[in-house]
Every structure is written in structure tokens, then in C-alpha cells.
Amino acid sequence: MKSKIISALLSVVMILPFINLSDTKATGFTMKRTIHSDSAMLINLDCDTVIFEKNADAKQMPGPLVNIMTAVVCIENCPDLSTEVTVDESVYSELYETEYIDDLRFADIYDSDVLQYTDLLYAMMLTSSVEASQTIAYNISGGNIQTFVEMMNEKAAEIGLDATHFTNATGMYDPKQYTTARDIAKLTQYALKLPKFDEICSTYVYSPLVPNLENHPDRQSWKWYHSNLMMDEESEYYYQGVRGIKTANLEKGGRNIVALSSRDGNNYLAVALKSPMNSSDGDTVFYHIEDASDMFDWAYTHFSYKVILADTAELGELPVELADGNDYVLARPEREVSLLWYDEIDVSLISRSNIVWNQEKLKAPVNAGELLGQVTLEFSGEPLATVNLVAVSDVKRSALKYNMYVAKLFPKSKWFKNAFIISGILCGIYIVLCIYAVVMRQKRRKPMKPKYAVPKVDKKNKK
């Protein structure tokens, strides 16, 4: 999983297609309808959570979904999207001879048309216009479309699209060009952060700002409509609240779609790749749109934000020494935890038993809100979120217990040892001084021979 999931909301696990329900009392669930696309993914953008995936890492042909990257490189390398560009038909005319001409889409852009980069982005993102994508690639790269493709691949590596490789800016069929549902979702999430991208992709109909009146005398009739039928209110595939981002069709790659839907404050991104273009009876079908709609319906019907841990929940207690009164303190979560949750799974099945205390015992005083430890919420053995545990209330210290504790502890303290050593040294010094004083006193008491005494007379010699 990507590093983002080690972040604030570890709610990726509640995406229950990845959870083994055999260890719980839950009945499990499946999508109510079959997903026809070979690869699919549904992400809640609000918490960056994958809530459904099918073959999300299988390599598929992107088709004109490539235009998402074309738009990214254009937006990031064009200082002013209002800059005008004169269209040169020779930049894309060679595509007329491609083997898979039916895969290509055109927007009635002609040679010498003068359009802003903004216009070209609208034409490309709404209709998959190869005139627009080739013109963007040619001009942004300074006249070398292959250089632009290299810029696309460099950006893919920077974003972390590890299973994606681009060979052209149009999405034209090329077996060497591939991607995955996971990479397309990651690319789209990146693109949505860029200026103008969301606005462009969310537009259903657009008219160029600076038409060449010679090529387009009826300016009002020159309009580009988004190819995503989910945005067409008159279509049977209309889906309220959808933002159409991009569709793609390839004869050899099937139908692809990336769509964004918003409802009741929830935002979902759906990706469907390699959907059949025809039914078993040979009828034209739009299973990619049906798959996106089904994924959105499933999410809106069965997922909602639920409080899985209240900040008032008591999750254990710790013993408190020297307490005045209760000799324990209760622990509660520091904050409330709300996660996007599947409504058929009871939140009571979430385990709260994985608690790590900072200390096994506390000493008073303890203040309300003081950090005591952490609890990790788990479902089916997988972590959902980690929350700090704090003290519910104050625990005051008993003066009597504290004084007795200090008195008992003092003989074992380093202060006591230091005091004992210092006292011993001082006593030793005192004894030495006392001995010295006694010796000196005795010396002072011993009689001394007078310096000028009269010599004793020897009477015998005198005679």
C-alpha cells in the first residue's frame, strides 16, 4: 500500500473486499451487480480510501485516458493557458492513415485555427480530439512530439505510476502503451489538484473562445460535448452529481472510463478499464458506464461515516500509587474516531483490545487529559486507526502517603549515599584535627630547659 495509508486515517482496511470475514460474525457482502470491466477501482477521495477493486494491477490499454497525462504536462509547462496557438494540420494529418482510424476522435479543428491552450484542453478532455492532443504535444515540447512523450513518462515516474508507459499523447492504439486501474486513479487524483483540470473535465458542453471565422462561420454551432453520457441529462445513462473526467474507446482495448461523483459531501472516483464494446448478441453496450454507476450506487447505499470509537469510551484503568482516594485512573480516547464504514458490518466487531500503556503503574498526582498510552482499533486482524489514551479525571496526591514514601525511599537514594559519604569524610577530618590538637597540647605542657641557666658547680673539683 502506498505511504499515504500510514497517515491520519488508516481506514483503508474497512474496505471490506480485502478483509477476510471468516473470523467474524459478519455475513460478508458482494457487489449486487456484475462488474463487466476487466479492471475496476472505486476510491473515496475524502479519506483516500479504496473501497472496491477488481484486477486493479492488471495492465490494460489506456486509449485516450492518456489525455489525462497530456493535460497534466500541458498545465504544468504552460505559464499562461490563455496563450494562443495556431493549429498546423501537418502535426496530426499522419494519423489519418492509421490502421485503427475508428479509434480516433476529431473535434473539427482545422489548419490555421487559432485557439488558446484552454480551448485545446477542452477539446481533448471532452472529445478525445487528436488534433488538440497533437497540437498541445507539438507546441509544449518545442516542436518534437517524442520529447513530449518523454516528458509524460518522466512525470509518470515522478508521480509513482510504476505500471504505466506512454508512447503517444493521443491514446492511439499501441501495444507498448499500457497502464493499470490503480495507476489511472493515482494519476487522476494528481491531476485534480492542478488548476483548471477539474473545471475542464466537469464541463458538459464548451465553445472555443477564439474561432477562425473562415473555418467556422457559425460560431454558435461549434460546440464540444463531453463524451461521458453520465453527464447528459437526456441520456438513459445520466447520473446526478457526476463529473465526467474522461472516457476512452479502443477496438482492441475495449471501453474505459474515469468518473468522479459527489453526493451528500462524499466524493468518489471510479475507474473501469477494458469493458466489452458489444454484448454476446453483438449489440453495442456501454458496460463501462454501467460499471461506474453501479460502483457509485453501491458506495452511496452501503457506506457512510460512523463513529467507531467515542471519546467518552472507557478503555481500561491504571493503578495509581500515593493517591488521595481512588487508587486508579480510567483511560479514554483522546479524540473521537469516525471512519467510512460498510453498513452490513456491525462496528461492535471492531477490536479495542490492542492497548499499549506508557507505564504499568502511575504515581499521583495525575492530571485529566494526561497521556497514558495508545489503542489500535482492529477489524479481522487488520489495523484501522491508532488513538492516544488519556486520563479521564484528576487523581490527587495524598500528603501522608507521599511523606511516608519519601522517608522510606530516602535511605536508598543517591542523596542519602552522598550525604553518608560526605559525613564520613567530615568525621574523618574532624578526628584528624582532634588528634592533631591533642598532640600539640601535649607538646606545649612539656618543661623546657632555661636558655640562660647557671651551670651546676662540681664541689669535689673545687676543693
Predicted segments with their positions:
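Bacterial N-terminal signal peptides that target proteins for export
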Residues: 1-9
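Hydrophobic core
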Residues: 10, 14-18
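Active-site-adjacent loops and short helices of periplasmic peptidoglycan-processing enzymes
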Residues: 20-182, 186-195
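Domain-terminus/edge residues, biased toward the C-terminal soluble/receptor-binding domains
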Residues: 161-162, 175-178, 182-183, 188-424, ...
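Alpha-helical transmembrane segments forming the membrane-embedded cores
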Residues: 457-463
